[in-house]
Amino acid sequence: MLKRISTQQLTLGMFVEAVEGTLSNQRFSQRHRFLLRHEELMRQLKLSGAESIIINTAKGYDAGSSARSAAVSPQPDNCPETVAAVTHAVRSAADAIAETFASAEAGGSVSLKGMATATGKISDAVQSNPAIFIGVTRLKSKDETTFVHSVSVSGLMILFGNYLGLDRGTVDLLGISGLLHDIGKVEIPSSILNKADGLNANEREIINLHPAFGRDILSRNAQMPEMVIDVCFNHHERMDGGGYPSGRAGGEISLYARIAAICDVYDAVTSVRPYKKPWTANDALTWMLRRDGHFDTQLLKKFALCISASLPRS
């Protein structure tokens, strides 16, 4: 049910469908619909000059709810219908990226329209229930690892972009960037991609070429946004210069590529795969924070808070 309330009635756990009025902070007019999870975001929204807020009481708390205002979010709705809807969105997006990869492998260009549609589905799934989305995308069979990984990274980048308060257009491009960050792997032999044990030095050199391959594939489309190409080419760069393909460091790496690096590694180590056990979110984030020089430390700390707020408390 949609309901119009004043900004002073806002509480954490409400699902915001729209912000009405002439805003001093224009980012709220460009944001996706979102679940209000964080005190700072709520404070900024109350100071934005909004005349009223449209909330969806079916997806979050109602005004005057007896729920404690200190709660970060409502408990995830784990009913079969919700799980089925999120699973369908993930599979649909995975199918879309699989078709895109096949087209790229055959020499075709990437359709931005198709990727935008897939990103919209991912965004809806993430915003409706991030915990279920993260849970569904952790499960990856051998045949679909690359595709579901792409969907998962896309969703994590959307989730984190919204947490950071980025505008809607930027968050949309983050989602597309996540979907396409590994497209260069279509040029890598499947025997290397699907190898369960460690890669030898020669195989590692080959797989390290995939960012450059991806940049070239994406550049076939003259309308491809620079951010998408940047993320594809630089998501394996590291803050200390120890990454690849160019050994960029610090300020040479864009915010968007830094976000992608965090989301890419987080999904990789927390995923359920046939040949390894997944790490818990806490173990993954602890390990990542200890990797001195790999990630943007301040950004990673914010990502940890974002994930903590998105997953149910044990």
What are these regions (language model features)?
Residues 45, 195-217, 238-314:
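Divalent-cation-assisted or electrostatically stabilized phosphate/pyrophosphate-binding catalytic cores
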Residues 46, 127-131, 158, 184, ...:
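Signal for well-folded cores of large energy- and translation-related assemblies
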Residues 34-35, 164, 197, 222, ...:
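Helix-turn-helix-type domain boundary/helix-start signal
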Residues 118, 139, 174-177, 210, ...:
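Short acidic/histidine-centered micro-motifs embedded in hydrophobic/aromatic stretches
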Residues 179-186, 227-236, 255-260, 275-277:
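A glycine-rich, aromatic-flanked flexible loop/lid motif
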Residues 1-110:
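Membrane-cytosol interface segments
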